[in-house]
């Protein structure tokens, strides 16, 4: 007789505490020991592996190193950098962008003054204080914003070709503020040694708590599937078969890097994708249908047109293309 492990019927949501930035999720019943196992891996992935947007660097006019004082500004550069690290964004763009600001007169410079071009991003904590500019002074500043996962220290955050005076900033990309879990005993029938795992997730508002645990679960599943599909008697491939696999992989990778403008699309669809910063087929297939429909001027007619184009290449929306190292 095969022993069936006890599995949760579903993940419950504590509606009484649920907000746009906080979620409490309950998984029960679990076999003994699985509460800690699942809680630990979910916590680690939520904190370290979810993508987010952060300020990666700054250039301030008249400043050439990060330990400077700025004439006419109350805060020195280290204080301004610390404040900029705390700015949180909601962003649809996949690549880095830059915005320039000129703060003049007696002004309290806050995160809300950081304005995106063409709606590339939205500042969530607009009231966050950045600096105070004194009367008669001007603060000219360029802010570099990028996408990433987890945390990236400043020393690893200095791309080539940056202008003189560029100051790299420790980038806190993770959209998760805090994660904690607790494990309690729960009863199934006469047995009381099953477990209930309670997972608390707090986000910065750029992602809903529900979406964050769903994405974390997908990341975990994508890794576990290699173990689930593992066979101790792996097939032996000939050199020709290995070459065929490499060729197929490279062919798909090349296809995903193909520019959108190379597709036979209407002007309307092409303009919608350009405004959404969808530049390649890889950018397109990684999006879900409902995500595309949220873009300005993008309707079902455009969606149908794109579907027909993707079907020609045996592609579809919502594909996981991470193995092809799309950048």
Swiss-Prot record:
A single GO cellular-component term on record: DNA-directed RNA polymerase complex
UniProt source species: Chlorobium phaeobacteroides (strain DSM 266 / SMG 266 / 2430)
Keyword terms: DNA-directed RNA polymerase, Nucleotidyltransferase, Transcription, Transferase
Region (Alpha C-terminal domain (alpha-CTD)): 247-327
Pfam families noted in UniProt: RNA_pol_A_bac (PF01000), RNA_pol_A_CTD (PF03118), RNA_pol_L (PF01193)
HAMAP family attached to this UniProt entry: RNApol_bact_RpoA (MF_00059)
Documented EC number(s): 2.7.7.6
UniProt cross-references to SUPFAM superfamilies, sorted A to Z: C-terminal domain of RNA polymerase alpha subunit (SSF47789), Insert subdomain of RNA polymerase alpha subunit (SSF56553), RBP11-like subunits of RNA polymerase (SSF55257)
Disulphide-bonded residues: none
Protein name, per record: DNA-directed RNA polymerase subunit alpha
Role summary: DNA-dependent RNA polymerase catalyzes the transcription of DNA into RNA using the four ribonucleoside triphosphates as substrates.
GO molecular function: DNA binding; DNA-directed RNA polymerase activity; protein dimerization activity
């Amino acid at each position: 007789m095969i022993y069936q492990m006890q599995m949760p019927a579903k993940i419950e949501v504590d509606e009484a505490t649920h907000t746009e930035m906080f979620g409490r999720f309950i998984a029960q019943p679990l076999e003994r020991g699985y509460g800690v196992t699942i809680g630990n891996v979910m916590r680690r992935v939520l904190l370290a592996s979810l993508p987010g947007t952060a300020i990666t660097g700054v250039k301030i006019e008249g400043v050439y190193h990060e330990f400077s004082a700025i004439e006419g500004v109350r805060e020195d550069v280290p204080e301004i950098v610390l404040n900029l690290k705390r700015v949180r964004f909601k962003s649809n763009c996949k690549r880095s962008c830059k915005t320039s600001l000129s703060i003049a007169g007696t002004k309290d410079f806050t995160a809300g003054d950081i304005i995106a071009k063409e709606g590339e991003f939205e500042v969530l904590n607009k009231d966050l204080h950045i600096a105070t500019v004194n009367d008669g002074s001007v603060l000219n500043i360029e802010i570099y914003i990028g996408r990433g996962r987890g945390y990236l220290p400043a020393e690893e955050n200095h791309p080539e070709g940056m202008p003189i005076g560029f100051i790299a900033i420790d980038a806190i990309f993770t959209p998760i503020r805090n994660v904690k879990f607790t494990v309690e005993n729960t009863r199934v029938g006469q047995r009381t040694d099953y477990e209930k795992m309670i997972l608390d997730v707090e986000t910065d508002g750029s992602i809903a708590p529900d979406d964050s645990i769903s994405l974390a679960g997908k990341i975990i599943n994508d890794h576990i599937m290699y173990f689930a599909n593992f066979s101790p008697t792996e097939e032996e491939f000939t050199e020709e078969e290995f070459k065929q696999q490499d060729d197929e992989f490279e062919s798909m990778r090349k296809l995903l890097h193909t520019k959108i403008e190379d597709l036979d699309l209407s002007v309307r669809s092409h303009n919608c994708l350009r405004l959404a910063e969808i530049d390649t087929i890889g950018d397109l297939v990684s999006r879900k249908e409902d995500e595309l429909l949220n873009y300005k001027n993008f309707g079902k007619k455009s969606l149908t047109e794109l579907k027909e184009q993707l079907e020609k290449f045996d592609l579809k929306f919502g594909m996981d293309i991470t193995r092809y190292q799309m950048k």
